[in-house]
Amino acid sequence: MSEPGELSCVRICKQAEETIVARRQNLLIGVVVGIVVVAALTYATGLSKQLLAPFGSSAEYKGSESATAPELATGEWINSEPVKLNDLRGRVVLIEFWTFGCYNCRNTLPFVKSWDDRYRAKGLTVIGVHSPEFEEEKNVEHLRREVASLGIRYPVVTDNDYQTWNAYKVKGWPTVFLVDKQGRIRWKHVGEGNYDEAERQIQKLLAEKES
């Protein structure tokens, strides 16, 4: 027959064992939750970099590499009557895919506006293609107010159904295309940055003779 002291020891040992098991279970749950959180953050960060591309990447197209720029899909136009790229042959066209809720786009905007001011009279046409990220950005009147508030003077066209976005195979905001006087895509930049190179490309295309 067990003594009271022995029973007390058994209870204490059993309680200690249960405590250790519970702690191990909690630790395991914590590790699993931590792994899930890290994986989710990693995915979200990768997705953000893919869509917003803050560090930027550029590509130049020459000769046979250059393709004719797809026509802009029909949408609501702000600051202009509807524009057709075919009607802009003989001018260099800068097409920027953006959305007013994108902070990367807002960081890029002062440069795009300055190029419009500096080179419009020299043969550059800037067109903003507004491809919304969120549902509320599809409201045309809201977009009109944002365009006015941001001091954008160049034409902006809505792309709420992403037809133009898909035609140009855009992956993120902002994305800039430079189209030469023959209507061919000659340069592309995704994300922020590389503004000096963008301006050099504009100057180079403006200097080219129309063939």
Predicted regions and their residues:
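N-terminal targeting signals for export/organelle localization
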Residues: 2-71, 211
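A short beta-strand-turn-helix
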Residues: 71-93, 119
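Short active-site neighborhood of thiol/selenol oxidoreductases, capturing the structured segment around
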Residues: 83-106, 126
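Loop/turn elements at helix/coil->beta-strand transitions in domains of secreted/extracellular proteins
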Residues: 89-93, 121-125, 151-154, 181
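Structural microenvironment flanking redox-active thiols in thiol-disulfide oxidoreductases
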Residues: 106-150, 157-167, 200
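Thiol/disulfide oxidoreductase modules built on the thioredoxin-like
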Residues: 148-153, 158-203
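Short, hydrophobic alpha-helical segments
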Residues: 202-210
